[in-house]
Amino acid sequence: MNSSYNHHIVKSYDDELNRLVTEIIRMGEIAVAQLEAALDVVERRDDKAADRIVMNDEAIDALEQSISHEVMRLALRGPMARDLREILAGLRIPADIERIGDYAANVAKRSIALNTMPPLPQTASLRALGQLSAQAVRNSLLSYSNKDEQIATNVRENDARLDAQYTALFRELLTYMMEDTRNITPCIHLLFMAKNLERIGDHATNIAENVLFLLNGEQMLPPREKCDNTSNVNLDCILD
């Protein structure tokens, strides 16, 4: 087989890998748009817009299926070591993006229930947490698109800040429930929404870790710092 033919095959494969990355980034951008729209409808108390976000989640699911088929097709062509890491990242990252889309839809869905009750001041804290999560996702996608190790490392390290903000909101909501039992139901919805946002941050970190794997191979990463201390909070005062 002559060298020009080999070059053509390699270039064709590289082009297909590049198209795969572009499609995964597009999927990620849709998921971030869904998340930012969900945060917006919580603030505006817009049921119709929330319904649209929930329905739009199907588009992300369909994209994941399409990307998964494309990844498997490329995998069957016997990629080399670096390309194999690209293939593995191409399987893992869309799965994280799909979960991000699911959590964004969950936030929108709970906002509809929340809109039947008086507004709570803690929605501002929820939005701040959501903005941190959205930025983490955007940065993880940027690290993937640019193959940027430093951005990926920063996303991973900043997850502790997001956890700390989630814990602070968790405590704030518990205090608000203790002050008036009428706050319990809306605060529980906000607690679930906050947890969804915290999990989105975790999935953004997963994407960043897959970028580090893609760039460096099987390299042992230091343990991820976790600052989610909600499991240590005493709930007896609410349950009594």
UniProtKB/Swiss-Prot annotation:
- Any GO CC annotation of this UniProt entry: cytoplasm
Designated gene of the protein: phoU
What's a single GO MF annotation on this record?
Answer: protein homodimerization activity
Q: What's this protein's name?
A: Phosphate-specific transport system accessory protein PhoU homolog
Report quaternary structure and partners: Homodimer.
Signal peptide interval: none
* Major localisation: cytoplasm
Organism phylogeny: Bacteria, Pseudomonadati, Pseudomonadota, Gammaproteobacteria, Lysobacterales
**Keywords of this protein's UniProt record, alphabetized?**
Cytoplasm, Phosphate transport, Transport
Q: What SUPFAM superfamilies does the record tag this protein with?
A: PhoU-like
State what this protein does: Plays a role in the regulation of phosphate uptake.
The record's comment on protein family reads: Belongs to the PhoU family.
The cellular location(s) given in this protein's UniProt record come to: Cytoplasm
